[in-house]
């Protein structure tokens, strides 16, 4: 268990260091090929991948990862950057200066021979044992067909390894050359004249499968040839300045000098061949870089859209909640007004003014509900809700435009990065090709046939260079017109629009119901008022009729009294007479 924890800790530290180096070297052309490794060891990439393909990871793990990533970007990374700058300034640069000052005084030729002698003896012993015990068994297993296939694979991975080794060394050299200077060339110059034949012999021929297994007789020879096929040695050989080349020529024997000339010619040939092979890698590099930039563009867009949509989703959630609260407030106001349509009229005992109560007669209402008042409530509700929904649609349109502008800005930024990368790599390749042409012009063979072949190869290489340059331009156009994935933005917009439309329809239907209910209440109240008026009118007419009858009866009674009085007077008069 302890070993497993140590292994996990070691891998975590290595991945962390790799990611930091990737971020530190992201703008360096020499380290560009390592971006694939950086990409597939980036935890953020795997977090995005698992979030897209696993709902459980997206809901449970991804939020915590985002929190940790934000804390790292805000709290940890600035501290590491500051510490790196301080360490580089305080420790690394002074250390390189001290080493450089010591290397000027150090004669490494003796130490080289001291280390080389035991290594040669060890190698002889190893190959003697190998030829005696291991080689016979391997010959039975490694057939000619298998060896041929193995050779192809080895050459393939050897070229790839050499390419990465070259760009890594260039990257390191580009970053620390201003401190160290040309110390490496000075150190190599101390013993290069002593092993000139070995250096040039390493590039005189292409190693065969038999070169991988040395015989006993070869091991017993006094003069050991360096059989390494590292193309880095070729680069070191052809990058000798004029002074070092003169020093080598002055200290070498005549036969070694002739061997140097042949080696130089072979170097040119191998450099041309290597240049032709590297064009295929260059094409693959352009394709890989294009895919990386597209993936980075899609990743940046996805990250921005995710954050923006989450933020706007919360904003619209609050807006819909506010809209719902306001609509309920308006609907409640209209409903109360509708309930108070059937009100009861009363008289204030103190002021003698009319007052109104609800239909139960227990609660006084502020005012008498009329059709004009309810119609005003409906118009106010409708206009307010329309303003709110229109404002939300306007905000949604502005958000969509903002996202599109940001996506275009991200695209332009990535295109600019690719253009800068393309300019640098084209410049580097043009320098390399011009350098090879210069080497061919000064170190080429006197044979006209060989010179014509070199010119033909140079012409083919320049055509391939032009093709690669056009490929970069086409890739740039492809990036400039690469459409972003805005499906989530469209889905979010459709969702919000659908919700707004649903709210508008529901509120319209509810207002229609309230309007119908208000009309019914008003019609009922008007009917009751008509009936009351008719009853009052009938009562008034009945009262008037009763009054008329009473008046007529009184008049008749008065006439009867007058007639009785007259008769009495007449009778009395008659009796008197």
Curated annotation (Swiss-Prot):
* Protein name (record): Outer spore wall assembly protein SHE10
Q: Where is the composition biased (Low complexity)?
A: 562-577
According to the UniProt record, where is the region Disordered?
525-577
Composition bias (Basic and acidic residues) maps to 525-545
Chief place where the protein resides:
mitochondrion
Instruction: Point out the signal peptide segment.
Output: 1-23
Gene Ontology CC terms, in alphabetical order: mitochondrion; ribonucleoprotein complex
Q: Which family does it belong to?
A: Belongs to the SHE10 family.
| Gene Ontology annotations of biological process type | sporulation resulting in formation of a cellular spore
Supply the source organism's classification: Eukaryota, Fungi, Dikarya, Ascomycota, Saccharomycotina
Question: Gene encoding this polypeptide?
Answer: SHE10
What is the scientific name of the source organism? Saccharomyces cerevisiae (strain YJM789) (Baker's yeast)
């Amino acid at each position: 268990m302890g070993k497993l924890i140590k292994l996990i800790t070691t891998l975590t530290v290595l991945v962390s260091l790799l990611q930091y180096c990737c971020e530190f070297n992201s703008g360096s052309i020499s380290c560009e090929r390592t971006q694939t490794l950086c990409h597939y060891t980036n935890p953020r990439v795997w977090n995005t991948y698992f979030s897209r393909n696993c709902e459980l990871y997206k809901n449970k793990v991804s939020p915590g990862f985002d929190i940790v990533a934000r804390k790292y970007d805000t709290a940890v990374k600035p501290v590491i950057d500051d510490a790196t700058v301080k360490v580089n300034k305080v420790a690394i640069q002074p250390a390189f200066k001290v080493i450089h000052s010591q290397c000027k005084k150090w004669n490494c030729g003796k130490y080289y021979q001291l280390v080389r002698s035991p290594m040669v003896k060890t190698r002889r012993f190893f190959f003697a044992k190998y030829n005696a015990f291991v080689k016979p068994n391997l010959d039975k297993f490694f057939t000619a067909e298998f060896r041929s296939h193995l050779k192809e694979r080895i050459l393939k991975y050897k070229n790839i390894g050499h390419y990465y080794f070259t760009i890594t060394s260039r990257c390191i050299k580009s970053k620390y050359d201003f401190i160290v200077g040309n110390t490496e060339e000075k150190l190599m110059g101390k013993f290069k004249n002593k092993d000139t034949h070995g250096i040039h012999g390493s590039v005189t021929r292409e190693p065969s499968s038999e070169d991988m297994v040395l015989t006993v007789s070869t091991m017993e020879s006094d003069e050991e040839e360096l059989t390494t096929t590292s193309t880095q040695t070729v680069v070191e050989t052809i990058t000798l300045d004029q002074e070092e080349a003169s020093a080598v020529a002055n200290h070498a024997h005549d036969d070694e000098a002739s061997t140097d000339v042949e080696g130089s010619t072979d170097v040119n040939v191998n450099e041309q061949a290597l240049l032709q092979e590297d064009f295929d890698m260059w094409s693959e590099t352009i394709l890989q870089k294009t895919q990386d930039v597209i993936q980075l563009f899609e990743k940046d867009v996805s990250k921005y859209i995710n954050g923006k949509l989450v933020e706007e989703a919360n904003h619209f959630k609050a807006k819909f909640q506010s809209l719902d609260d306001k609509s309920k407030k308006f609907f409640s106001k209209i409903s109360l007004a509708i309930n108070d349509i059937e009100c009861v009229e009363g008289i204030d005992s103190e002021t003698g003014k009319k007052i109104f109560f609800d239909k139960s007669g227990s609660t006084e209402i502020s005012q008498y509900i009329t059709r004009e008042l309810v119609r005003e409530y409906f118009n106010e509700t409708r206009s307010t809700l329309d303003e709110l929904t229109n404002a939300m649609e306007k905000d949604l349109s502005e958000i969509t435009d903002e996202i599109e502008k940001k996506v275009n800005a991200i695209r332009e930024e990535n295109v600019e990065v690719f253009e800068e990368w393309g300019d640098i790599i084209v410049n580097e390749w043009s320098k390399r090709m011009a350098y090879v042409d210069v080497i061919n012009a000064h170190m080429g063979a006197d044979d006209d046939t060989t010179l014509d072949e070199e010119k033909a190869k140079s012409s083919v290489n320049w055509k391939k260079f032009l093709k690669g340059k056009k490929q970069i331009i086409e890739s740039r156009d492809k990036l400039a017109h690469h459409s972003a994935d805005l499906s989530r933005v469209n889905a979010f917009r459709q969702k919000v629009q659908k919700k707004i439309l649903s709210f508008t329809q529901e509120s319209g239907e509810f207002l229609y119901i309230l309007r119908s209910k208000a009309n019914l209440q008003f019609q009922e109240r008007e009917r009751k008022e008509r009936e009351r008026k008719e009853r009052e009118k009938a009562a008034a007419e009945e009262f008037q009729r009763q009054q008329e009858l009473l008046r007529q009866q009184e008049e008749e009674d008065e006439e009867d009294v007058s007639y009785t009085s007259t008769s009495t007077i007449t009778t009395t008069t008659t009796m008197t007479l």
